[in-house]
Amino acid sequence: MKKDLHPDYHVINVVMTNGTTFQTKSTWGKEGDTINLDIDPTSHPAWTGGNQHLLDRGGRVSRFKDKFKGFA
């Protein structure tokens, strides 16, 4: 196997939307970093059967709606 070809594979902490925390191995971040999920199996409509909702991160959805509001 070639040296320095593959990314570092290490343990990170994952925090789900309900506060549950678990550890998994990933190439994301550094050893011991924490990732907070916006959507996970406990809150995603595909798994919960609820209505779909949009997360407006950075106003992207609002800008899209404003741009195409008269188009239908």
UniProtKB/Swiss-Prot annotation:
InterPro entries noted in UniProt: Ribosomal_bL28/bL31-like_sf, Ribosomal_bL31, Ribosomal_bL31_A, Ribosomal_bL31_sf
HAMAP family (UniProt xref): Ribosomal_bL31_1
Lineage: Bacteria, Pseudomonadati, Pseudomonadota, Alphaproteobacteria, Maricaulales
Protein name: Large ribosomal subunit protein bL31
One Pfam family linked to the record: Ribosomal_L31
Keywords assigned by UniProt, alphabetized: Ribonucleoprotein, Ribosomal protein, RNA-binding, rRNA-binding
Molecular function as annotated in GO: rRNA binding; structural constituent of ribosome
Domain of life: Bacteria
NCBIfam families assigned to the protein according to its UniProt record, in alphabetical order: L31, PRK00528.1
Job description of the protein: Binds the 23S rRNA.
Signal peptide: none
PROSITE patterns (UniProt xref): RIBOSOMAL_L31
One GO term of the biological process aspect: translation
GO CC annotation, single: ribosome
TM stretches of this protein: none
Homology family: Belongs to the bacterial ribosomal protein bL31 family. Type A subfamily.
Subunit structure: Part of the 50S ribosomal subunit.
